[in-house]
Amino acid sequence: MKLLKLSTTIIILFTFFLSLSIEARIWKDKKGNEIEAELMSIQAGKVFLKKSNGKTLRISKKTLCEADQKFLETAVPPKVKIDFSKNQDRRSDRYDIYMQCKIIITKTSSATHSGKLKATLLVIGKYERRPAFIILDKVSSKFTFNDSKTFTLEGKLFRMHDYYYSSYGQKYIGYIAIITDKNGKLVEIKSNRKEFLKDYKKIIMFRKGAVFDRKFKATTI
Protein backbone atom coordinates (compact mmCIF):
# COMPACT_ATOMS: atom_id res chain seq x y z
CA MET A 1 0.00 0.00 0.00
CA LYS A 2 1.39 3.37 -0.97
CA LEU A 3 1.03 6.15 1.54
CA LEU A 4 0.89 9.79 0.53
CA LYS A 5 3.42 11.87 2.45
CA LEU A 6 3.08 15.56 3.16
CA SER A 7 6.32 17.05 4.55
CA THR A 8 7.45 14.32 6.98
CA THR A 9 4.02 13.20 8.12
CA ILE A 10 1.68 10.61 6.75
CA ILE A 11 -1.69 11.95 5.73
CA ILE A 12 -4.51 9.74 6.86
CA LEU A 13 -7.82 10.56 5.27
CA PHE A 14 -10.91 8.91 6.65
CA THR A 15 -13.92 8.83 4.33
CA PHE A 16 -17.18 8.73 6.19
CA PHE A 17 -20.17 7.22 4.41
CA LEU A 18 -23.04 9.49 5.24
CA SER A 19 -26.15 7.95 6.71
CA LEU A 20 -28.95 10.37 6.01
CA SER A 21 -31.41 8.77 8.45
CA ILE A 22 -33.97 11.50 7.77
CA GLU A 23 -37.30 10.70 9.39
CA ALA A 24 -40.25 9.78 7.21
CA ARG A 25 -42.00 12.78 5.67
CA ILE A 26 -44.58 13.53 3.01
CA TRP A 27 -43.13 13.83 -0.49
CA LYS A 28 -45.04 15.41 -3.36
CA ASP A 29 -44.39 15.32 -7.08
CA LYS A 30 -45.23 18.00 -9.64
CA LYS A 31 -48.58 16.33 -10.37
CA GLY A 32 -49.66 16.58 -6.74
CA ASN A 33 -49.21 12.90 -5.89
CA GLU A 34 -48.08 12.33 -2.31
CA ILE A 35 -46.25 9.56 -0.51
CA GLU A 36 -44.89 9.14 3.01
CA ALA A 37 -41.38 7.75 3.04
CA GLU A 38 -37.89 8.03 4.52
CA LEU A 39 -35.06 9.50 2.48
CA MET A 40 -32.31 6.92 1.97
CA SER A 41 -29.91 8.45 -0.54
CA ILE A 42 -29.47 10.48 -3.72
CA GLN A 43 -27.44 9.10 -6.60
CA ALA A 44 -27.05 10.52 -10.11
CA GLY A 45 -30.20 12.61 -9.87
CA LYS A 46 -32.27 9.75 -8.45
CA VAL A 47 -33.89 9.95 -5.02
CA PHE A 48 -34.20 6.68 -3.11
CA LEU A 49 -37.08 6.56 -0.63
CA LYS A 50 -38.15 3.77 1.73
CA LYS A 51 -41.80 3.28 2.63
CA SER A 52 -43.00 2.04 6.02
CA ASN A 53 -43.48 -1.46 4.55
CA GLY A 54 -39.79 -1.60 3.64
CA LYS A 55 -40.27 -1.12 -0.09
CA THR A 56 -37.68 1.11 -1.75
CA LEU A 57 -38.70 3.61 -4.42
CA ARG A 58 -36.45 5.29 -6.96
CA ILE A 59 -37.71 8.68 -8.11
CA SER A 60 -36.17 11.25 -10.43
CA LYS A 61 -35.36 14.39 -8.45
CA LYS A 62 -36.72 16.51 -11.31
CA THR A 63 -40.22 15.04 -10.89
CA LEU A 64 -40.53 16.25 -7.28
CA CYS A 65 -42.29 19.50 -6.47
CA GLU A 66 -40.17 22.63 -6.12
CA ALA A 67 -40.46 22.65 -2.31
CA ASP A 68 -39.12 19.10 -2.03
CA GLN A 69 -36.27 19.83 -4.44
CA LYS A 70 -35.29 22.81 -2.27
CA PHE A 71 -35.50 20.59 0.81
CA LEU A 72 -33.01 18.16 -0.72
CA GLU A 73 -30.57 21.00 -1.45
CA THR A 74 -30.20 21.66 2.28
CA ALA A 75 -30.95 18.25 3.80
CA VAL A 76 -28.31 16.26 1.94
CA PRO A 77 -24.72 17.40 2.65
CA PRO A 78 -22.33 17.58 -0.32
CA LYS A 79 -19.18 15.54 -0.80
CA VAL A 80 -16.13 17.68 -0.14
CA LYS A 81 -12.34 17.48 -0.29
CA ILE A 82 -10.07 19.14 2.28
CA ASP A 83 -6.57 20.39 1.46
CA PHE A 84 -4.31 21.56 4.30
CA SER A 85 -1.23 23.76 4.05
CA LYS A 86 1.08 25.64 6.42
CA ASN A 87 3.77 28.31 6.23
CA GLN A 88 6.45 28.90 8.82
CA ASP A 89 9.60 30.95 9.34
CA ARG A 90 11.85 32.21 12.12
CA ARG A 91 11.94 35.84 11.02
CA SER A 92 14.62 37.67 13.02
CA ASP A 93 14.14 35.74 16.25
CA ARG A 94 16.00 32.44 16.30
CA TYR A 95 14.17 31.35 19.45
CA ASP A 96 10.69 31.55 17.98
CA ILE A 97 8.95 29.95 15.03
CA TYR A 98 6.04 31.72 13.32
CA MET A 99 3.41 29.64 11.60
CA GLN A 100 0.10 30.11 9.79
CA CYS A 101 -2.16 27.32 8.54
CA LYS A 102 -5.17 27.11 6.26
CA ILE A 103 -7.53 24.65 4.63
CA ILE A 104 -9.25 24.80 1.25
CA ILE A 105 -12.57 22.98 1.09
CA THR A 106 -13.72 21.93 -2.37
CA LYS A 107 -17.20 20.66 -3.23
CA THR A 108 -16.74 17.52 -5.34
CA SER A 109 -20.36 16.40 -5.76
CA SER A 110 -22.35 17.80 -8.68
CA ALA A 111 -25.69 18.17 -6.88
CA THR A 112 -26.67 21.68 -5.79
CA HIS A 113 -26.32 22.35 -2.06
CA SER A 114 -27.53 25.63 -0.60
CA GLY A 115 -27.39 24.78 3.11
CA LYS A 116 -24.90 26.23 5.56
CA LEU A 117 -21.85 24.25 6.58
CA LYS A 118 -19.29 24.86 9.31
CA ALA A 119 -15.54 24.41 9.00
CA THR A 120 -13.23 24.12 12.01
CA LEU A 121 -9.43 23.91 11.92
CA LEU A 122 -7.31 23.07 14.95
CA VAL A 123 -3.51 23.16 14.86
CA ILE A 124 -1.84 21.07 17.54
CA GLY A 125 1.59 21.24 19.10
CA LYS A 126 3.56 19.31 21.69
CA TYR A 127 5.73 20.37 24.59
CA GLU A 128 8.89 18.49 23.71
CA ARG A 129 10.19 18.09 27.28
CA ARG A 130 6.82 17.68 28.97
CA PRO A 131 4.03 15.11 28.43
CA ALA A 132 1.49 17.62 27.19
CA PHE A 133 -0.08 18.97 24.00
CA ILE A 134 -1.41 22.42 23.15
CA ILE A 135 -3.92 23.93 20.74
CA LEU A 136 -1.68 26.35 18.84
CA ASP A 137 -4.52 27.78 16.78
CA LYS A 138 -8.24 27.26 16.34
CA VAL A 139 -10.51 28.91 13.80
CA SER A 140 -14.01 28.16 12.56
CA SER A 141 -16.45 29.70 10.12
CA LYS A 142 -19.84 29.02 8.58
CA PHE A 143 -20.07 29.03 4.79
CA THR A 144 -22.09 27.90 1.77
CA PHE A 145 -21.28 26.77 -1.75
CA ASN A 146 -23.86 29.13 -3.28
CA ASP A 147 -21.32 31.35 -5.05
CA SER A 148 -18.28 29.10 -5.34
CA LYS A 149 -17.25 25.45 -5.23
CA THR A 150 -14.42 26.26 -2.85
CA PHE A 151 -14.06 27.88 0.56
CA THR A 152 -10.82 28.87 2.27
CA LEU A 153 -10.45 28.96 6.04
CA GLU A 154 -7.23 30.64 7.11
CA GLY A 155 -5.87 30.54 10.62
CA LYS A 156 -4.09 33.35 12.43
CA LEU A 157 -0.34 33.78 12.53
CA PHE A 158 0.94 32.30 15.79
CA ARG A 159 4.32 31.98 17.49
CA MET A 160 5.94 28.95 19.07
CA HIS A 161 8.95 28.95 21.36
CA ASP A 162 11.46 26.58 19.80
CA TYR A 163 11.75 23.50 22.00
CA TYR A 164 15.50 23.32 21.38
CA TYR A 165 16.01 26.51 23.39
CA SER A 166 13.37 26.37 26.12
CA SER A 167 12.03 23.75 28.54
CA TYR A 168 8.59 25.15 27.71
CA GLY A 169 9.31 25.01 23.98
CA GLN A 170 6.78 23.63 21.55
CA LYS A 171 6.75 22.01 18.14
CA TYR A 172 3.99 21.53 15.60
CA ILE A 173 2.83 17.90 15.34
CA GLY A 174 -0.41 18.04 13.40
CA TYR A 175 -3.85 19.36 12.61
CA ILE A 176 -7.45 18.30 12.33
CA ALA A 177 -10.05 19.82 10.00
CA ILE A 178 -13.73 19.14 10.59
CA ILE A 179 -16.72 19.97 8.37
CA THR A 180 -20.26 19.69 9.76
CA ASP A 181 -23.71 20.48 8.40
CA LYS A 182 -26.34 22.83 9.84
CA ASN A 183 -27.41 20.13 12.31
CA GLY A 184 -23.89 19.47 13.54
CA LYS A 185 -23.55 16.15 11.70
CA LEU A 186 -20.16 15.24 10.33
CA VAL A 187 -19.69 15.88 6.61
CA GLU A 188 -15.93 15.33 6.33
CA ILE A 189 -12.86 15.18 8.51
CA LYS A 190 -9.13 15.10 7.80
CA SER A 191 -5.98 14.88 9.90
CA ASN A 192 -2.41 13.67 9.72
CA ARG A 193 -2.71 11.59 12.90
CA LYS A 194 -4.94 8.61 13.70
CA GLU A 195 -5.44 9.57 17.33
CA PHE A 196 -6.84 12.97 16.35
CA LEU A 197 -9.40 11.36 14.05
CA LYS A 198 -10.43 8.87 16.70
CA ASP A 199 -10.99 11.50 19.41
CA TYR A 200 -12.00 14.51 17.32
CA LYS A 201 -15.12 15.09 19.46
CA LYS A 202 -12.87 15.73 22.47
CA ILE A 203 -10.33 17.83 20.59
CA ILE A 204 -12.89 20.15 19.02
CA MET A 205 -14.06 21.20 22.49
CA PHE A 206 -10.68 22.72 23.39
CA ARG A 207 -10.06 26.44 22.96
CA LYS A 208 -6.93 27.99 21.50
CA GLY A 209 -4.15 27.76 24.08
CA ALA A 210 -5.69 24.77 25.87
CA VAL A 211 -3.23 22.17 27.19
CA PHE A 212 -4.16 18.48 27.33
CA ASP A 213 -2.61 15.06 27.91
CA ARG A 214 -2.42 11.92 25.79
CA LYS A 215 -5.94 10.93 26.83
CA PHE A 216 -7.21 14.31 25.61
CA LYS A 217 -7.99 15.52 29.10
CA ALA A 218 -7.29 19.12 30.10
CA THR A 219 -4.11 19.54 32.12
CA THR A 220 -1.49 22.12 33.10
CA ILE A 221 2.25 22.42 32.57
Residue ranges and their predicted role:
Residues 1-7:
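Positively charged n-region of N-terminal signal peptides that target proteins for export
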Residues 7-19:
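Bacterial N-terminal signal peptides
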Residues 20-136, 141, 159-174, 200-206:
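Compositionally biased alpha-helical segments
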Residues 78-82, 143-146, 217-220:
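Noncatalytic linker/hinge segments flanking ATPase motor cores
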Residues 108-115, 144-148, 182-185:
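A short, structured loop/turn motif at beta-sheet edges
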Residues 131-151, 191-197:
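Solvent-exposed serine/threonine-rich low-complexity stretches and specific carbohydrate-binding patches
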Residues 151-153, 219:
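Acidic, serine/proline-rich low-complexity intrinsically disordered regions
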Residues 159-221:
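Acidic, serine/threonine- and proline-rich intrinsically disordered appendage/tail regions
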